[in-house]
From Swiss-Prot:
HAMAP family membership: UPF0145
Record Gene3D superfamilies: Hypothetical protein apc22750. Chain B
Native species: Photobacterium profundum (strain SS9)
Pfam families assigned to the protein according to its UniProt record, in alphabetical order: YbjQ_1
InterPro entries per record: UPF0145_dom_sf (IPR035439), UPF0145_YbjQ-like (IPR002765)
Record family assignment: Belongs to the UPF0145 family.
Disulfide bonds: none
Name recorded for this polypeptide: UPF0145 protein PBPRB0184
Length: 103
């Protein structure tokens, strides 16, 4: 599945717009990661546990958006975007969304 952040795909013609696609993941913090993150905020540096967690969540959100597009018969997703929001204390949502199209 071709996924782009632009509204068009160079060299390809969009023949049909199918609709919005989404994929989301709500990820909670692990207590052990949270304790280590607390130390990192005191001493500085990258919080690798959270970086890895968000990277995995972003990949899963994208996979779910692709599955949504495939279920609509799409060849590509254009205008792909990611957003992150806090759902509750200790949990964040990663949302991937875009427009499913046929080429």
């Amino acid at each position: 599945m071709l996924c782009v952040t632009t509204s068009d795909i160079i060299g390809r013609e969009i023949t049909e717009t199918l609709g919005v696609v989404t994929g989301n993941v709500v990820q909670s913090k692990h207590v052990g990661r949270d304790i280590m993150a607390g130390f990192k905020t005191i001493f500085g540096g990258e919080i690798r546990g959270y970086t890895e967690m968000l990277t995995e969540a972003r990949e899963e959100a994208l996979n779910r958006a692709i599955a949504d597009a495939q279920s609509q018969g799409a060849d590509a997703i254009v205008n792909l975007r990611f957003t992150t929001s806090a759902i509750m204390q200790g949990a964040s949502e990663i949302l991937a969304y875009g427009t499913a199209v046929k080429l």
